[in-house]
């Protein structure tokens, strides 16, 4: 039990460091932790960079707004690492995942935020510009797979009015 208390104190200190960065670095660090701890599957490096760059409700994704993975890791104070072999991001240890799961207050509306982010991406001009056909080219659409597969899963866990509006916008038959 003592080791668990030591780890809890360590994680609280590290999270305090992330928040103490203030401003954009604190926002990015906490957003990365939210995405990794609440995603429905491990995220690829490019997926998390895109997810963090999306502004909910925006129709455009500016490539200049997409952070580098090194910038995101820097904001996380050593709590996140990249598995080089499979190019996914993960928390440094399973006990940190357990810690985050037992502290849901750290991430206000995590699943609704994630659903809104996925739906914003799917409703964006970037995703709509994808031409469907026999030679479907997904390069440059690095968040498409995750957002199209998991927006509903996040929405089922935690529904928000905004997510519902974005889902109805996506499914609007008049736009197809």
Q: Which ranges hold each PLM region?
A:
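Leucine/isoleucine-rich amphipathic helices and adjacent mixed helix/strand linkers
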Residues: 1-176
């Amino acid at each position: 039990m003592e080791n668990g208390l030591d780890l809890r104190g360590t994680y609280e200190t590290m999270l305090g460091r992330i928040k103490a960065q203030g401003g954009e670095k604190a926002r990015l660090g906490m957003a990365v932790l939210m995405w990794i701890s609440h995603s429905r599957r491990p995220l690829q490096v490019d997926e998390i960079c895109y997810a963090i760059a999306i502004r909910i409700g925006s129709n455009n994704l500016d490539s200049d707004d997409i952070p580098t993975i090194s910038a995101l890791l820097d904001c996380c104070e050593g709590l996140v690492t990249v598995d080089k072999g499979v190019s996914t991001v993960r928390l440094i240890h399973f006990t940190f995942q357990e810690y985050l799961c037992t502290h849901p207050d750290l991430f206000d509306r995590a699943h609704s935020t994630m659903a809104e982010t996925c739906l914003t991406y799917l409703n964006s001009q970037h995703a709509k510009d994808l031409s469907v056909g026999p030679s479907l080219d997904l390069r440059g659409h690095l968040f498409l797979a995750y957002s199209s597969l998991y927006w509903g899963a996040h929405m089922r866990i935690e529904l928000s009015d905004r997510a519902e509006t974005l889902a109805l916008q996506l499914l609007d038959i008049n736009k197809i």
